[in-house]
Amino acid sequence: MSDTPDLAGVWKAKILTLFPEAFPGVLGESLTGKALQQGLWQLETVDLRPFGIGKHKNVDDTPAGGGAGMVLRADVLGDAIEHAMQGTAGNWPLIYLSPRGRRMDQQMMQTFARCDGLTLLCGRFEGVDERVLEHYGIQEVSLGDFVMTGGELAAQALIDATVRLIPGVLGNQASTEEESFSSGLLEHPQYTRPADWKGRAIPDVLMSGHHGKIAEWRQDMSEKITQERRPDLWAAYQARKSKT
């Protein structure tokens, strides 16, 4: 177990996993890694294996009713969850990374960033005993409509998307306000030096210094890209505009 003392007021992610060595992984790099070192957020892993049954610390068994694969046992997960939830208080959801869960989006990440912390259960094999999800009221969350070999990568994606919304992590609040989904639209194109590359020039308006025209261009491009690439987001954006 990598138990770490809770710092008052600091957002914390607790990870229940068979592969604790997979963390922090990419979360230990760049801005999230720097913020972790600075104590702006915390990470704790809980290894499921020590909670296993018998001499071999078995954590799984065959599916009731037959079928392929193995299922993580309810008694093993229950003990691990109760260990992980010791000392947690306030708004602290239990999350299970699962392809049948609600798909992650920016609004969900904003909600998670306002929590006191999260406990994330990373599945393996054919999943987890359903009784665990029911007993603890666990929320199922999905990275997308595809199946992975385990929940660790999805957990890292969720944590990264959440941690970057915590005040002080990015250093510039405008960065989160201007990026994709913050306004319900996809982000406008970005450019930097050189001004001309392989015959492709930066749009003149961005070099004009006219902030009003730049803002208008960026809004127009965000709307155009959203309409072309994500008609679902565009329809929702139009519906919100019609109500204002």
Swiss-Prot record:
Pfam families per UniProt:
tRNA_m1G_MT
Predominant subcellular localization, coarse grouping? cytoplasm
Q: Which organism is it from?
A: Ruegeria sp. (strain TM1040) (Silicibacter sp.)
Top-level taxon: Bacteria
**Protein name listed in UniProt:** tRNA (guanine-N(1)-)-methyltransferase
Q: Where in the cell is it found?
A: Cytoplasm
Question: What CDD domains does the record tag this protein with?
Answer: TrmD-like
| Entry's family note | Belongs to the RNA methyltransferase TrmD family.
Record's catalysed reaction(s) = guanosine(37) in tRNA + S-adenosyl-L-methionine = N(1)-methylguanosine(37) in tRNA + S-adenosyl-L-homocysteine + H(+)
- Listed EC numbers: 2.1.1.228
Q: What does this protein do?
A: Specifically methylates guanosine-37 in various tRNAs.
InterPro entries named among the record's database cross-references:
Alpha/beta_knot_MTases, tRNA_m1G_MeTrfase_C_sf, tRNA_m1G_MeTrfase_TrmD, tRNA_m1G_MTases_N, tRNA_MeTrfase_TRMD/TRM10
Give the record's subunit note. Answer: Homodimer.
What is the uppermost EC class here?
transferase
**Which residues does S-adenosyl-L-methionine bind?**
123, 143-148
Name the Gene Ontology molecular function terms of this record: tRNA (guanine(37)-N1)-methyltransferase activity
Alphabetized, the UniProt keywords read: Cytoplasm, Methyltransferase, S-adenosyl-L-methionine, Transferase, tRNA processing
Biological process, per Gene Ontology: tRNA N1-guanine methylation
- One GO cellular component term: cytosol
Q: Which Gene3D superfamilies match?
A: 3.40.1280.10, tRNA(m1g37)methyltransferase, domain 2
